Design a protein with these regions (language model features):
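A charged N-terminal "starter" segment
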Residues: 1-117, 122-136, 177-179, 183, ...
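Glycine-rich tight-turn/loop motif centered on a GG-T
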Residues: 21-23, 92-93, 111-116, 152-165, ...
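Conserved radical SAM core fold
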Residues: 60, 81-83, 103-106, 144-161, ...
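Non-cysteine beta-strand/loop elements that form the S-adenosyl-L-methionine
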Residues: 77-80, 98-101, 137-153, 184-189, ...
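Metal-dependent enolase-superfamily TIM-barrel catalytic cores that perform enediolate-based chemistry
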Residues: 124-127, 160-178, 200-212
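Glycine-rich beta-strand-to-loop/alpha-helix junction loops that act as flexible
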Residues: 191-192, 226-233, 272-276
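Short glycine/threonine-rich loop-to-helix capping motif typified by GTGT followed
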Residues: 197-204, 235-248, 279-291
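Charged (often Lys/Glu-rich) extended helix/loop segments that serve as interaction or gating elements
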Residues: 257-261, 265-325
Length: 325
């Protein structure tokens, strides 16, 4: 198996642990910034492009500040994430609030911050109107149902997911929201998680671009942005090739030129809500080996545990280990 090279050396870690005892997480700020800039470059063809970092991926204010300096907004899905983003200085359309089964106080706080609200369900229109008010800019989440495939590979099953509105519901929602005074609409969808494929975003884009054209014709609304959400992933094992964000951006551009431009919708902004792609390659959990155990298998005990990295314990996720010593 090919080697994965950490962004820190043994000598650097030896110096760091003198001040910060293990276990701890360490991040490559230079790598994070370069990746954010490369993402912006990949979508530079779209005048309104913006990345809304998925705060749930790493709810760390220092990380949020770095990404804010690189021109990113934030994607929040809870009150805590909204509060953290507020404290970090994100305001207005720098915040995208996407949640489901949303409590009244979360909608109220999102409106207080003038965040862009992404409605998950058609019934939330009346609820939002009751507990707060209907803003002039709003987004609705779409679920196409069925199975989402790339070629012969099934990527995920949107029909089994609780998120989003059906095709009929989103059209009805747009009409109702237009009557309630909404002037600018957005469309959002999330169909697959951690895809290691350059085709996911372009295929999703085609679906949403065609939907946008249809909804504009049916409802007469102004669609200002289309949010591709997250789903662009990273390879966890060293033998897999990472996604090429430049190829992905070009694929979305081609779909944009093919579908939206002929429909007179070339001014639509493209948004993304990447989390894992933005940070996962640039963070390490540093832990120290402290015990050996020899029974039916050989074990090396470390000073980190599930509370430091929960994914392997919860569902057997693979995380590559590099021994620096």
């Amino acid at each position: 198996m090919p080697k994965k090279i950490p962004f820190v050396t043994k000598s650097q870690i030896e110096q760091i642990v003198k001040e910060y005892p293990t276990p701890f997480h360490i991040y490559d700020e230079k790598g994070i910034r370069e990746n954010a800039r490369k993402l912006k470059q990949a979508f530079s063809w779209n005048k309104g492009f913006k990345e809304y970092f998925a705060v749930k991926a790493t709810p760390n204010p220092h990380i949020l500040k770095v990404l804010q300096e690189e021109g990113c907004g934030v994607d929040c899905s809870s009150l805590t994430e909204l509060m953290m983003s507020d404290k970090c200085g994100f305001k207005n359309d720098d915040i995208m609030f996407s949640s489901n089964d949303t409590p009244a106080n979360e909608f109220q706080y999102a409106r207080k911050l003038n965040a862009t609200i992404n409605l998950d369900d058609i019934t939330h229109i009346d609820f939002l109107k009751e507990v707060a008010d209907i803003p002039e800019v709003i987004s609705c989440r779409f679920n196409p149902g069925g199975v989402f495939s790339l070629g012969t590979d099934i990527m995920d099953n949107p029909g089994d997911a609780k998120y989003g509105m059906t095709r009929e519901q989103i059209a009805e929602a747009f009409k109702k929201l237009k009557e309630l005074g909404v002037k600018e609409f957005g469309i959002h969808s999330f169909l697959a998680s951690n895809t290691v494929s350059n085709e996911y975003y372009p295929e999703l884009a085609k679906i949403l671009f065609k939907l946008a054209v249809e909804l504009k014709e049916e409802t007469g609304v102004h669609i200002g942005f289309i949010n591709l959400s997250g789903g662009v992933g990273i390879p966890y094992t060293p033998d897999k090739e990472p996604n090429d964000i430049m190829v992905i951006g070009e694929g979305v551009r081609k779909a944009f030129e093919e579908v939206l431009v002929p429909a007179g919708m070339g001014d639509v902004a493209i948004y993304t809500e990447l989390g894992r792609f933005m940070l996962a390659p640039y963070g390490h959990l540093v832990t120290k080996a402290i015990h050996e155990k020899h029974i039916y298998k050989e074990y090396i005990g470390v000073d980190a545990c599930a509370v430091n990295l929960m994914r392997p314990a919860m569902y057997g996720a693979y995380h590559h280990i590099t021994v620096l010593g």
